[in-house]
Regions:
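C-terminal substrate-binding/catalytic lobe of Rossmann-fold NAD(P)-dependent oxidoreductases
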Residues: 1-129
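NAD(P)-dependent Rossmann-like dehydrogenase/reductase catalytic/cofactor-binding core
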Residues: 109-159
Length: 159
């Protein structure tokens, strides 16, 4: 296994920025969620896999497994609304098979731009747990940058 210093901290902090908001000239991280992580690198050619454990805030009605899958299955983001060239038609794909998602099977789904999710089930310590995976280069670094540029152009921030 390879170890990269700072990777776990980054995976805990970056989503808080992404889901945060801009106030003045600063990004204010969201405080709606709490993330903890442990990163383990294994020798695969392409793909990142995450085991996710989640709980809902007190006072929030906990959705059922079926409701969560329905939300994921019907999710459409701004990239889909604008029909951007690099955007997958369906950003999230939920798999009902107990052994999915798998990197070799799903990494190139929708030209590598989709996120594959599966194994959503109740957890004994948290409300739910699930597994998700995406292509680290196509959805991640390179493809993510292209999609972001397409979005900036479509929204009028770039020519």
């Amino acid at each position: 296994m390879l170890f990269r210093s700072g990777e776990e901290e980054k995976s805990e902090q970056e989503p808080l920025k992404i889901w945060g908001k801009i106030e003045g000239d600063k990004i204010v991280k969201t405080d709606d969620i709490s993330i903890t992580s442990q990163c383990i690198r294994v020798p695969v050619s392409d793909g990142h896999t995450a085991a996710v454990f989640m709980s809902f805030k007190d006072g929030v009605k906990k959705p059922t497994v079926e409701e969560i899958i329905d939300i994921w299955s019907n999710y459409s983001g701004r990239a889909q609304e604008l029909d951007l060239p690099s955007a997958p038609k369906h950003f999230l794909h939920y798999f009902t098979e107990p052994d999915r998602p798998q990197i070799k099977s799903e990494r190139n789904l929708e030209n590598g731009m989709a996120v594959s999710v599966g194994r959503l089930r109740p957890d004994t310590q948290y409300d739910y747990k699930f597994v998700c995976m995406s292509h680290n280069t196509l959805r991640g670094a390179a493809g993510g940058a292209v999609l972001l540029a397409e979005l900036l152009c479509a929204e009028g921030y770039m020519d």
